[in-house]
């Protein structure tokens, strides 16, 4: 990796889906050997997947690594209904396919579904789209800090989806009362919430 960096093949060394201990170990190895240091981390982060606030993001702050949040709408979970989740799904949410099995293992859990119902109720009462609420919350009410190089990875299959996401983000912060209700959802879901896409619940045993 260091040779590729010195050859000008990339500008920043990034990590993704690492545990905090792994980030520290890799950083220390790079430091000791004068290798290029990681300066950006891409990690799961949404209103219902916030475990990284407790350890990973603080570690990134200490090491000078910016944090780019992927799945700000939790892989599409936050735009679904509880009824739809219980029925299964189509596309990447089809439980008969590998990706669908993964997504259901991450999100189709009792506390997550309870939080999803709360999410829908808040959106309906506030007159907001569920995706809009997620994008605006993560942008303006989370621990992400643009001054530290943090950002959001917006997944879109069509240009129109990206444009729509950017438009709702430009609306600015949510009403403080709405943001507080969203904060409260975390207390509902945190025991069932996944840590990242590939380690899911397994990280509990590694902490």
Write out the residue ranges for each language-model feature:
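Conserved, mostly hydrophobic/aromatic
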Residues: 13, 41, 60, 67-70, ...
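Glycine-rich beta-alpha junction loops
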Residues: 19, 45-49, 71-82, 137, ...
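Generic structural signal for well-ordered alpha-helices
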Residues: 1-2, 23-27, 57, 116, ...
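Glycine-enriched alpha-helix->loop->beta-strand junction motifs that scaffold or abut catalytic
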Residues: 9, 29-39, 60-68, 144, ...
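Aromatic-lined glycan-binding groove of carbohydrate-active enzymes
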Residues: 52-97, 129
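Terminal-tail/helix-coil boundary detector
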Residues: 62, 86-114, 118-121, 125, ...
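Glycine/proline-rich, positively charged
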Residues: 1-48, 55
């Amino acid at each position: 990796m260091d040779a590729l960096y010195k050859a000008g093949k990339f500008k920043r060394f990034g990590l993704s889906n690492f545990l905090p201990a792994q980030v520290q170990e890799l950083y220390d190895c790079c430091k000791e050997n004068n290798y290029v240091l990681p300066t950006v981390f891409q990690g799961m982060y949404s209103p219902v997947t916030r475990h990284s606030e407790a350890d990973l993001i603080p570690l990134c702050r200490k090491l000078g690594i910016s944090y780019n949040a992927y799945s700000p709408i939790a892989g599409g979970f936050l735009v679904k209904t509880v009824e739809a989740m219980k029925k299964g799904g189509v596309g990447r949410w089809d439980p008969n396919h590998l990706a669908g099995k993964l997504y259901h293992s991450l999100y189709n859990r009792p506390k997550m579904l309870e939080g999803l119902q709360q999410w829908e109720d808040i959106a309906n009462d506030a007159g907001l789209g569920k995706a809009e609420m997620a994008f605006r919350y993560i942008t303006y009410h989370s621990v992400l800090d643009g001054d530290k190089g943090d950002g959001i990875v917006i997944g879109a299959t069509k240009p129109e989806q990206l444009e729509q996401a950017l438009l709702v983000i430009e609306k600015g912060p949510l009403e403080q009362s709405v943001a507080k209700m969203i904060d409260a959802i975390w207390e509902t879901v945190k025991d069932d919430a996944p840590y990242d896409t590939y380690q899911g619940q397994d990280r509990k045993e590694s902490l």
